[in-house]
Amino acid sequence: GGVRNLGVPTVTDRFVQQAIAQVLTPIYEEQFHDHSYGFRPNRCAQQAILTALEMMNDGNEWIVDIDLEKFFDTVNHDKLMTIIGRTIKDGDVISIVRKYLVSGIMIDDEYEDSIVGTPQGGNLSPLLANIMLNELDKEMEKRGLNFVRYADDCIIMVGSEMSANRVMRNISRFIEEKLGLKVNMTKSKVDRPQGLKYLGFGFYFDTRAHQYKAKPHAKSVAKFKKRMKELTCRSWGVSNSYK
């Protein structure tokens, strides 16, 4: 419901960003976790849902749903550049990425510096987001947790409510203290699969098959129908104007 600022680059900047992304992507693809599905080659939301179902049906029936508050707007530049510097040693590449982060945005014809966050709308932003959150993936793997992440949408699946509450506390602390990000505790929750809405899907237990399954969430379906109705009305309006 809020306003999201987009840092739309010029044609030249977009070309440079794409070139940098093409260089960095294969390097980081070797580091990214198998359960990270957002903004990566040959990966999609449906794969994330299937992986989540496998974990739920393996006895992990308590969900830790962590909501990152305004993730793209709150990425700490110094922390991100430190992470990148562990892998990338080319000073020119580091310099270009740093300049991209602080490139700023125009609001009402006025320039504003970018002190934190990654500019949304650029070619590099999704890759930088995954580089930052790969640190979270590594921490969760180190703790032996079952998780699925699609960009900044992450769920963790565990076997008991007690474990889920403990994981919520520990992982939230790691996110805020080690990554410098903010967890929205109002939206974050511990729940069963039936109470979860993830990537537009809801989950239910099929008593005949004795397993959890997924289907488009009712809210997502309602939103889609509303959008289609708006588009249909708009199309009819155009047609009528030419009668």
What is the predicted function of each stretch?
Residues 1-243:
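Non-catalytic terminal/accessory segments
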